[in-house]
């Protein structure tokens, strides 16, 4: 494998000539990761992992530290852009059948779960009102584990409730996990370039390849620059656009927010969790909302990879995207009719995609055989 990679580098990484802009999100994600590690380091210098000082230390960073407000807001907005890019990256993989490269896809799902854990721990650190209560609700789900649940939850909390030890270990985990993400990203990229990138047509890229640099590197640079410009526009004109208003108040265990919810990029999973009126069932559904992404590599039934020439599969795919948006929207609403019913229906549609897609692909095979 090492010899192969030496050849790839010496040949300036030959890739298919027809890969589109949808293939640019990998480089955008790498840029986001570098940005998050850099800004996170400077924030960690001034942050204090103590329940009495955490909120004040974040206020100190934004008010007193030179350029601190830029670091803090860039880190917060960067997290949102990170998840926008990763969700588009996953959607691209589903649409173009890139999951058939099993090793790359499964390493990507592992990366996604690590990233979500990192983002969750980071959301708790400012010790705002919504941070505290979201952490209480989500970590309390561990009590649903049979026999071991209470012991695991107590161990994670470092006591019988979320307190100072919890914040300290969450800070430690949030600090160390990005380095694990960097390692997993390296594995993801090595596995990808071991077999080579696919293309929008799903054909063999070996027929027509060009050097990655300068042809695709400049294309990557354009989308990455556009993303950074978008980040600076939000940072300059509406830095609190993606923040929860409740987090501008210090955590108070005696006052429960009217509607507890995590950051917007977790709302689809939270919406699926809320749609099931059972703690264990909801927790399993929450886990399956991510783990079900491991299914497509083993259930692909169509004889070509992408959905480019499959109108029925395309319709189902865009239904999944609409469902994802709808679940996210319902999760922002109170647990009352009609949002309960909408949430339950959209959750069923979400999981149905992964069952219906192989069946529909099989049907499309039959139709195409007859024509």
Swiss-Prot record:
Names of the cofactor(s): heme b
Keywords (A to Z) from UniProt: Electron transport, Heme, Iron, Membrane, Metal-binding, Mitochondrion, Mitochondrion inner membrane, Respiratory chain, Transmembrane, Transmembrane helix, Transport, Ubiquinone
Alphabetical list of Gene3D superfamilies matching this protein: Cytochrome Bc1 Complex, Chain C (1.20.810.10)
One GO cellular component, as annotated: respiratory chain complex III
InterPro entries: Cyt_b/b6_C, Cyt_b/b6_C_sf, Cyt_b/b6_N, Cytb/b6-like_sf, Cytochrome_b, Cytochrome_b_C_euk/bac, Cytochrome_b_N_euk/bac, Di-haem_cyt_TM
Record: residues binding a ubiquinone: 193
Top-level taxonomic group: Eukaryota
Transmembrane parts of this sequence: 25-45, 69-90, 105-125, 170-190, 218-238, 280-300, 312-332, 339-358
Residues reported in the UniProt entry to bind heme b b562: 75, 174
An individual GO BP term: mitochondrial electron transport, ubiquinol to cytochrome c
Residues given in the record as heme b b566 binding sites: 89, 188
Gene Ontology MF annotations: metal ion binding; ubiquinol-cytochrome-c reductase activity
Cofactor binding remark: Binds 2 heme b groups non-covalently.
Pfam name, any one: Cytochrome_B
Subunit relationships: The cytochrome bc1 complex contains 3 respiratory subunits (MT-CYB, CYC1 and UQCRFS1), 2 core proteins (UQCRC1 and UQCRC2) and probably 6 low-molecular weight proteins.
Note from the entry: Heme 1 (or BL or b562) is low-potential and absorbs at about 562 nm, and heme 2 (or BH or b566) is high-potential and absorbs at about 566 nm.
Family statement: Belongs to the cytochrome b family.
Protein name in the entry: Cytochrome b
Gene encoding the protein: MT-CYB
